[in-house]
Amino acid sequence: MIFRKLLPVVTFMISMSSFAQIRTGVYFSSDKKYKEIIEELGNPLEGNPVMIVKSFVPNHGSYVWYLNEKKIEKGTYFEGIPKDLYSGIFLEDHGGLIPQITFKDFAKDLGQPMYLINYCEVGDADKDGFPEFYLTYFGESDGLDAKPLKVIVYTKRGQKTLSKSKITGWIPYQEEDKYREESDASFKLLPKAIRLKAEKILKDAKKGIQ
């Protein structure tokens, strides 16, 4: 599922997920359901959610994915309003939340991390009945170094807890530098279908920011 604020796109993607029996809803602060989730479950992370995703997974339960931003007061050299990122996936349990995995990255020096919401997705690429969560973000910077574009993949793969894998594309700033990609050892062990999906997200996100 690709998360966009365009209602027709969101509706279509949700109906596709329903057909696959993994039912996913995507909510922003202007949505009534967003407010209902906050009232019922609260906000378990620092900052404010820019997006909340709920996925009901048959035989596993209901998962809630928060993607939060927090404006920082400490000084950085970054032009604009620096923000820290806090994200987490939680399992609903009798009106409460059980943490499954969390993420955070902080603004510092000349840069700050920035969610690429249009490229954060939930999907079941390997069709094993449990979705993968694809968190995509960019290391925006006023510096001259190459800037990281990252896709973090959260999978379960028969385990009790979610695990993290990552692929990074380094976006060159200077003409003499070249674009390159690197992935961690965990990413290399993912099923081919999941790797290909993450690589496509990275490719599409790269086009989207250039």
Roles of regions detected by a PLM:
Residues 62-67, 127-137:
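Acidic/hydrophobic-patterned starts of short beta strands in beta-sheet-rich repeat architectures
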Residues 33-36, 45-50, 108-119:
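Repeat-based blade/solenoid architectures
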Residues 20-48, 56-57, 147-150, 154-210:
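Acidic, small-residue rich beta-repeat scaffolds with periodic aromatic anchors
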Residues 73-82, 110-111, 140-145:
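Short consensus segments that form the blades of beta-propeller domains
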Residues 120-126:
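Acidic, divalent-cation-chelating loop motifs in proteins
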Residues 99-112, 171-180:
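Surface-exposed loop and turn segments in beta-propeller and other repeat-based domains
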Residues 1-26:
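Bacterial Sec-dependent N-terminal signal peptides
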Residues 83-91, 151-156:
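Beta-propeller blade signature
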